[in-house]
Design a protein with these regions (language model features):
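Core segments of cupin and vicinal oxygen chelate
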Residues: 2-48
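Conserved short beta-strand elements that form part of the metal-binding/catalytic scaffold
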Residues: 29-61, 105-112
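Short, structured motif recognition centered on aromatic/hydrophobic residues
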Residues: 7-10, 24, 29, 40, ...
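Vicinal oxygen chelate
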Residues: 15-18, 35-36, 64-144
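N-terminal beta-strand motif that seeds the catalytic metal site of vicinal oxygen chelate
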Residues: 1-18, 60-63, 121-144
């Protein structure tokens, strides 16, 4: 049986969506808020790696995994008889929403269209505990 190929995103509830967006922007993510959902992406082709919606209490909502294929998604969804739906987020594809044994939401998606890669300028300065040399710049590290 095929299965999961990667962790795709995490989803949270936050008490202040704009403050969270600023934090992520300063951290170097590319962000946007669309219909009350904060979406953040890195420099790779994934249309989002972090999702957040506003709520009265901060909370972990779910983790999203990328299935190896639509067939793998269907196999995984069949384990619990979970319906497969059209993914309403950027990149489209299909999604199955499951619940793990501890009650946490797990989303498994397939066939999400990649976004274009984001270019990263030369080496950026590093932030430390005293001085912030890099605000709002994305940083990518080359693999060794």
């Amino acid at each position: 049986m095929t299965g999961i190929k990667d962790v795709l995103y995490v989803r949270f509830c936050v008490t202040d969506l704009q403050a969270q967006q600023k934090f992520l922007d300063d951290f170097g993510f590319q962000t946007r808020i669309d219909d009350g959902l904060l979406m953040a992406r890195g420099t790779d082709g994934s249309p989002y790696i972090y999702l957040a919606e506003e709520a009265s209490e901060p909370a972990f909502v779910s983790v999203g995994f990328a299935a190896e294929s639509e067939a793998a998604l269907r196999d995984i969804a069949a384990i619990d008889g979970t319906p497969i739906e059209t993914n309403p987020l950027s990149g489209g594809g299909l999604i199955a929403r499951l619940t793990d044994p501890n009650g946490f939401s797990v989303e498994v998606v397939a066939d999400i269209a990649d976004s274009s890669l984001l270019t990263v300028a030369g080496r950026s300065g590093f932030n430390d505990g005293v001085e912030k040399q890099r605000l709002g710049e994305r940083v990518a590290f080359a693999a060794p």
